[in-house]
Structures are given as C-alpha cells and as structure tokens.
Amino acid sequence: MLEETEAALLARVRELFGATLRQVEPLTGTWTNEDVHRLFLAPPSVFLAWMGCGEGRTRREVESRWAFFVVAELLNGEPVNRPGIYQIVERLIAGVNGQTFGPTTGMRLTQVRNLCDDNRINAGVVLYGVLFSGTTPLPSVVDLDSLDDYERHWQTWKFPDETPEFAAHINVNQEKDHDAEN
C-alpha cells in the first residue's frame, strides 16, 4: 500500500515538472548527516518520504503523512527554466492537494515549513518541507478466498405484544425442494 502511494506521488511530481528538476526521488537512508547533506547537492530537486501515520476514521484505514522535501537555490525563480521554492511549492500543492495516489485518497495539505538554518541559506540553498495527509486503507488480514461459504447461522426474532421470542438455525445455502411445497 505504501509502495504504491509513493510510486504514484513520485510519478505525479515528474509529470508536474518534466525535466525542470534535477532529482525526483524517495528519501532513503537512515537520516544521518550524510543523508541530509545529500538533499542540498542537486537543487532544484524534490525528495519524498513517508512520515508515519495516525488513527483513521475506521479500523480499516490510517491517516498517512507524506513529506516532500523541496530544495532550490532561489526563493522566487522562473516558472519554466529555473524554478525557485515558491514555484515548486505552488505547483506541488496544486498537483497533489485533493487527489488520489495509489490506494491513498484525499491528500490534504497540512503544512509548509522552511527547514533551512542560516548556514544553508548563506550557502545559497533553501530547503522547504511540504506535508500532506491522506487516507490509506489497511490490507485485509483475512484472505477471503480461504473462507468456507457461509452455511448456517442462529437467528432470533422478537414479536410485539409480549409474544415470546422465536429462534432457529437457518441453513443459508440449502436447496429448496419447490415440488414438496406445492
């Protein structure tokens, strides 16, 4: 479920930007200093990471959080040839917000943050985080094909006016002999 969502989100970014970004990749690694430093090496670029999940509206889903890490040399660049943070963030929001990616539906923008410190800004590179949340269904833990057909269940009926309950086993898949009823 997460791999499908990640692949669909990355495909959408590539579709939105074509060849204007140097890198569009998942953010892999262990978040060491080297991994974080790698973000700043090829602006303009977009990296994607699943940031975890929270409780969904039902037991069968979770609220997944995804972060796009946007790196650029400019705050405000040229929309086509040399996009800056503003152009990349605007296009990401417009292209992702409210959409479905793989099994994850209803992607919603939750936050945009400047993640740079003064050292990076003085070096001429800016990093922004663009965070989205979406509903992701959980995979079923039961293989429905492995279950036998539903054969029998216990049913009770309550009638009005203090009539006693009626209860019976019902055979669901039993063939009726229509000739015997006539």
From Swiss-Prot:
Show the stretches that span the lipid bilayer: none
Q: Name one GO biological process term.
A: viral tail assembly
Q: Name the UniProt key words of this record, in alphabetical order.
A: Host cytoplasm, Late protein, Viral release from host cell, Viral tail assembly, Viral tail protein, Virion
Report the coiled-coil segments.
Answer: none
Q: Which GO terms describe its cellular component?
A: host cell cytoplasm; virus tail
Q: Does the keyword Signal apply?
A: no
Subcellular localization is given as: Virion; Host cytoplasm
What's this protein's function? May stop tail tube polymerization by capping the rapidly polymerizing tail tube once it has reached its requisite length and prevent its depolymerization.
Q: How is this protein named in the record?
A: Probable tail terminator protein
Q: At the top level of its lineage, which domain of life is listed?
A: Viruses
Q: Which organism is it from?
A: Escherichia phage Mu (Bacteriophage Mu)
